[in-house]
Amino acid sequence: MSIVLAYSGGLDTSVAVHWLKERYQTEVIAYCANLGQIEDLEAVSKRATAAGASEVIVEDVRDLFLHDYAIPALAAGAAYEGKYLLAAPLSRPLIAERLVSIARERGASAVAHGATGKGNDQVRFYTSVRALAPELDILAPVIDWEMTSRGSEIAYADRHGIDVGVSKTTPYSIDTNIWGTSIECGDLDLIDHAPPPDAWQITTAPVQAPDRPTTITIEFEAGIPVALDGRKLDLIDLVSELGDTAAANGIGRTEILESRIVGFKSRGIYEAPAATVLLAARTDLEALVLDRETLHHKRSIADQYAELVYYGYWFTDLRAALDAYCARLAHRVTGTVTVELYKGSARCIGRTSPKYGRYSSALADYEEADTFLHEAGAGFAYCWALPLTEGVVTR
């Protein structure tokens, strides 16, 4: 058999290439998804080859990731436990789908990942692959091998001449893509202490951000951001540029003591500058273009959608149905939002939607231009209170 391994270029998966090859006496195909991570992907490819991979596939999936995974989550307003914008969990079903596709193309009988037994990712990969290809074996070398610490993995790499580019002093576990960065482990496990300043990877500390606000405009068409400050951009460029601007202003930092899939709580800090601003802007625009009942109901699905993503239940009818629901409303989410970025805060200060906006200044005005029928309001209040009034009689 041959094995297709989800390869990141880090310690775990670099050791896994060699370990899988030796353990199963088979070829290991290393698959690395370009999701906009910071690493030098050419160096990552060379590292996989040096570790023993028979083939290395590096694939640019940034556009696919944004359009098919990040934007649907944005449309749903998904934030796990009200905070986490899910950059890493959103990438896992995409990686799993590509692993399955490559395994079928190459005739491989197994796929593998570098997740640990106590982490969320091993559940996400297992669940996604089982949903797509139950006939494939799913290998988890980090769970199966005899190495029990980061130090023992480094020692294994040294014994076998595997260059992993890390040391025992590396304090954090970091996962980065174009939608955001997650940071765990190290001193972050001391939950009664503030995160060390060096834990944050891409955002400026709000107190050190510029002393003058940065004002930007974001244009949406059918729910998708298409322009920044009046300039039409493809989605990759828009998210990248917005992310740089927001990060420089200290936007997108989140700290959460989250409830993991496997049953215990862990502390993570997350940076999602572009996603934070886009969610604020899209939510603000929805308030302008959606009627009250639709707006309130749509916001009620945000937690459920976030849980589906976090739990690894991407390939479910429920997630697809929620996407269809959001897509039905998306055409109205067309307009422009002005956002002020200042020392960690993204504040929507203006919005317009000439075609779908539901705001009427003539109705909302309390001055002479007021066109609201006040006598009708009094009658409405009487009818609105009737259920409560009648209840008093029967109680």
Swiss-Prot record:
Molecular-function GO terms, alphabetical: argininosuccinate synthase activity; ATP binding
A GO CC term assigned to this protein in UniProt: cytoplasm
Main location: cytoplasm
Nucleotide-binding in keyword set: yes
Keyword Transport tagged: no
This protein's pathway: Amino-acid biosynthesis; L-arginine biosynthesis; L-arginine from L-ornithine and carbamoyl phosphate: step 2/3
Gene3D superfamilies (alphabetical): Argininosuccinate synthetase, chain A, domain 2, HUPs
Residues the record lists as binding ATP: A6, Y7, S8, G9, G10, L11, D12, T13, S14, A33, G114
SUPFAM superfamilies according to UniProt: Adenine nucleotide alpha hydrolases-like, Argininosuccinate synthetase, C-terminal domain
InterPro entries cross-referenced by the UniProt entry: Arginosuc_syn_C, Arginosuc_syn_N, Arginosuc_synth, Arginosuc_synth_CS, Arginosuc_synth_type_1_subfam, AS_cat/multimer_dom_body, Rossmann-like_a/b/a_fold
PROSITE patterns: ARGININOSUCCIN_SYN_1, ARGININOSUCCIN_SYN_2
Catalytic activity: L-citrulline + L-aspartate + ATP = 2-(N(omega)-L-arginino)succinate + AMP + diphosphate + H(+)
Disulfide-bonded cysteines: none
Quaternary structure (record): Homotetramer.
Family named by the database record: Belongs to the argininosuccinate synthase family. Type 1 subfamily.
Protein name per UniProt: Argininosuccinate synthase
